[in-house]
């Protein structure tokens, strides 16, 4: 319902304008120009608003939108996020280190990324008799599934800061509509001791969440509790569990898949001006999976 939430925000804005400028009230969709603007998830939200019928919306500007459609090479965020979380740490070892952005500092991460290559080879996901061949195999798999070189380079930060796993953990709960303590892979959020064990958050920590936290742990004193954490590849088992929901069987997977399907976008209503701005180097929401397919679907539906 992201699109309807945008519409509700516009209705609230009209009401707020009426209270702030009573001498010019009433403000309505008929006498007020409404342009919906958003980036990332907000970009996806304003594109979903563009689907809604009625003359309430005058134009849409979407930046780097998290949006997916039927066909045209589109992939849902959960799909490519879980893929990247598994493969990208290994694949980046096949790319010249000088071409990759820092921070994060790459040298301390390399042992973990090398362990990922070993794990993926043992699981039959990639091929290669040595580390170089395994990294090349992971790199080729990502390119074959639609990742551009620019997106892979930009994705270095997401791999290095463990953002792919953070997004996947959170979105698995959201798409599957799982409550607190019911994550199907056993993940949880908590303040943590130095040994990563969970502990209650302090009052000061809780007080900072609203102003400082991004909403997606880890960060600001909230960590990810992963019951499957184990050496030598610490996060592999948990990531394999999350990846299994993309196309796998079982009730938990079906719930996640149903949630993803419910977020699929449709073309904008006819005649509505829509501007989509998306950088080719976006490594978090690659345009090849989001904006480009959306525009192709819109044009196929007769939108200009």
Residue ranges and their predicted role:
Residues 1-304:
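C-terminal His-loop and adjacent cap/lid subdomain of alpha/beta-hydrolase
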């Amino acid at each position: 319902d992201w699109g309807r939430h945008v519409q509700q925000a516009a209705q609230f804005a009209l009401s707020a304008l009426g209270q702030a400028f009573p001498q010019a009230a009433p403000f309505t969709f008929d006498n007020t120009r409404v342009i919906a603007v958003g980036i990332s998830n907000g970009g996806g939200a304003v594109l979903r608003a563009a689907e809604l019928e009625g003359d309430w919306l005058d134009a849409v500007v979407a930046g780097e939108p998290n949006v997916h459609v039927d066909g045209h090479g589109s992939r849902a965020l959960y799909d490519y996020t879980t893929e990247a979380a598994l493969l990208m740490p290994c694949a980046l070892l096949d790319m010249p280190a000088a071409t990759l952005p820092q921070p994060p500092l790459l040298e301390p991460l390399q042992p973990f990324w090398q362990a990922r290559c070993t794990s993926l080879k043992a699981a039959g996901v990639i091929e290669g008799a040595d580390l170089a061949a395994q990294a090349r195999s992971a790199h080729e798999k990502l390119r074959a599934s639609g990742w551009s070189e620019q997106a892979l380079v930009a994705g270095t930060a997401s791999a290095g800061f463990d953002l792919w796993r953070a997004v996947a953990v959170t979105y698995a709960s959201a798409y599957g509509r799982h409550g607190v303590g019911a994550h199907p892979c056993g993940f949880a959020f908590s303040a943590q001791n130095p040994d990563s064990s969970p502990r209650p958050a302090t009052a000061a920590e809780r007080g900072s969440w609203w102003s400082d936290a991004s909403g997606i742990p880890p960060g600001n004193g909230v960590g990810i509790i992963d019951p499957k954490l184990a050496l030598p590849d610490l996060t592999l088992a948990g990531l394999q569990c999350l990846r299994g929901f993309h196309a796998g069987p079982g009730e938990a997977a079906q719930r996640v898949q149903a949630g993803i399907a419910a977020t699929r976008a449709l073309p904008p209503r006819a005649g509505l001006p829509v501007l989509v701005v998306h950088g080719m180097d976006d490594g978090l929401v690659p345009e090849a999976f989001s904006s480009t397919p959306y525009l192709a679907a819109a044009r196929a539906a007769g939108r200009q």
